[in-house]
């Protein structure tokens, strides 16, 4: 795409985002009502679509993993990976889950077990068992399949095929170069930008709410909209500086530090918390997750509170992962250059998912233990304070809470930092080194988006906007998968003794041994 087209993508996206921010600032109640009505319509009519789409995406990832294409290098043949395995995993984890994991790791299991439950009566052992398996389900390989397939598409076309790092460029084999360089390609890139801004702004909104509640819980700092705006402004300055410093200096360093701090809290709570209960909960949850894998993947209640639960949780999560897919996908692709498709899928699909399971088992089980044994009423705590309310009842709770707060702050920066880089790429003809002023512009827009989300309804408004933004981009993801499979099917078999020859039927391509051809 030419520079002029890229500028148009940038300005069109910027105008759309600005209109949304202005509308939300002037008419917050109307925006809240509008997004709620649209969300209800989507949940009622498209829940089946979200569930089937994410499951099909997972099947596609598994198919490619065991196909003949698995040995293809995402880069030049023989190229070494840019980052070591530990650094790679740290960046996957920090950018891919970030604040959301810390935000929900305690609140979600407690909610499933003692509030709005998916199946069984609240507070029963069956509800507690459901809590962990559904938490694993929402944060497991389904989520990482969505990230992984989009990341694989970008990595394959950018590093193996040499295409620009744009969503539209990945559809060239499907729709043609001319179409992708025209208005259609520009519209697709605008959709990707809007989805990314929405997805990351939602994360910033969650982060601001939890940081504010954490400061209030620990230090009695006022918890209000003004303080949340101040936190977003401070964070914007920090992640803008990080984005300015470059991906290697900024994101890699912060990701490594945060992975270490997150595991300090994890191991600390595992030791001082109900260790045996945590181990039993993890094992039981994993078994239930595997045993009910497909029933959870395709489950749609007939109505009432159970359907409301589906909308509030599964549909919300699937939409969140789809909204985050262009951002996380491009970033994962960027840091995965030089790895084979097999190594890539195994790493992206399974390693972070297992880490998420462990986090949910430790934090979620620790909270459930307090609630189930009537030691503390964690279920009454606000979503944003559930983690801090849990930690305070265990030894070293204040210290662990402080570290947790720091982890959230760093996740805040790394998520937004990565997003400014990706948005800069999408606005700079796929340039892997976008100009700093472009990244700063997107940083400011994401901050304003997050502020408006909080202003118009807090957590619920964030969830509604995610579900809305994900629907149009999900169609683009389907096209990206189709384009990838089409291009892979045209790959020459990885056998140096075979060459492509012209078949008698001009529409048929045939590979034969070069030795056989020479002999004939």
Model regions: which residues?
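N-terminal alpha-helical transmembrane segments of multi-pass membrane transport
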Residues: 1-127, 267, 481-490, 514-519
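Helix-loop-helix module between adjacent transmembrane segments
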Residues: 2-4, 8-11, 15-25, 58-63, ...
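Hydrophobic alpha-helical segments of multi-pass membrane transport proteins
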Residues: 16, 49-66, 262-273, 355-365, ...
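Membrane-interface alpha-helices at helix entry/exit sites of multi-pass transporters
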Residues: 48, 85, 123-131, 179-190, ...
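Membrane-embedded translocation segments of transport machinery
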Residues: 180-182, 192-339, 346, 351-402, ...
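Long, low-complexity, intrinsically disordered cytosolic termini of multi-pass membrane proteins
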Residues: 498-520
């Amino acid at each position: 795409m030419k520079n002029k087209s890229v500028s148009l993508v940038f300005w069109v996206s910027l105008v759309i985002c600005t209109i949304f921010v202005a509308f939300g600032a002037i008419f917050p109640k109307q925006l809240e009502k509008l997004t709620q009505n649209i969300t209800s319509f989507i949940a009622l009519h498209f829940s089946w679509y979200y569930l089937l789409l994410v499951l099909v995406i997972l099947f596609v990832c598994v198919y490619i993993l065991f196909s003949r294409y698995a040995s293809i290098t995402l880069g030049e043949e023989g190229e070494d990976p840019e980052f070591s395995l530990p650094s790679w995993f740290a960046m996957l984890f920090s950018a891919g889950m970030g604040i959301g994991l810390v935000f929900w790791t305690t609140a979600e299991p407690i909610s499933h077990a003692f509030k709005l439950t998916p199946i069984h009566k609240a507070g029963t052992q069956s509800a507690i068992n459901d809590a962990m398996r559904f938490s694993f389900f929402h944060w497991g390989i389904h989520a990482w399949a969505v990230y992984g397939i989009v990341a694989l598409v970008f990595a394959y076309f950018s590093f193996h095929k040499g295409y620009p790092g744009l969503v539209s460029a990945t559809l060239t084999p499907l729709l043609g170069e001319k179409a992708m360089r025209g208005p259609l390609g520009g519209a697709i890139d605008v959709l990707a930008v809007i989805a990314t801004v929405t997805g990351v702004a939602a994360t910033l909104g969650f982060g601001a709410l939890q940081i504010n509640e954490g400061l209030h819980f620990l230090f009695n700092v006022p918890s209000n909209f003004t303080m949340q705006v101040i936190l977003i402004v401070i964070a914007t300055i920090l992640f803008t500086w990080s984005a300015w410093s470059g991906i290697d200096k900024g994101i890699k360093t912060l990701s490594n530090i945060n992975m270490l701090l997150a595991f300090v809290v994890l191991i600390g709570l595992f030791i001082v918390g109900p260790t045996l209960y945590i181990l039993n909960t993890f094992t039981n949850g994993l078994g239930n997750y595997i045993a009910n894998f497909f029933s959870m993947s395709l489950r749609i209640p007939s109505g009432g509170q159970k359907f409301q639960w589906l909308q509030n949780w599964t549909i919300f999560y699937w939409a969140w992962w789809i909204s985050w897919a262009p951002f996380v996908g491009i970033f994962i692709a960027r840091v995965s250059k030089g790895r084979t498709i097999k190594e890539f899928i195994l790493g992206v699909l399974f390693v972070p998912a297992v880490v998420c399971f462990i986090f949910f088992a430790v934090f979620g089980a620790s909270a459930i233990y307090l609630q189930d044994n009537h030691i503390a009423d964690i279920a009454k705590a606000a979503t944003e304070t559930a983690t801090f309310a849990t930690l305070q009842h265990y030894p070293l709770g204040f210290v662990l809470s402080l570290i947790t707060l720091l982890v959230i702050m760093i996740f805040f920066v790394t998520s937004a930092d990565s997003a400014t880089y990706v948005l800069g790429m999408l606005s700079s003809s796929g340039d892997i080194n976008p100009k700093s002023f472009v990244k700063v512009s997107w940083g400011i827009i994401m901050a304003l988006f997050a502020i408006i989300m909080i202003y118009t309804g807090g957590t619920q408004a964030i969830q509604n906007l995610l579900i809305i933004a994900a629907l149009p981009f999900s169609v683009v993801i389907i096209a990206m998968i189709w384009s990838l499979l089409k291009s892979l099917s045209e790959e020459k078999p990885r056998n140096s003794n075979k060459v492509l020859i012209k078949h008698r039927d001009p529409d048929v391509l045939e590979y034969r041994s070069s030795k056989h051809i020479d002999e004939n």
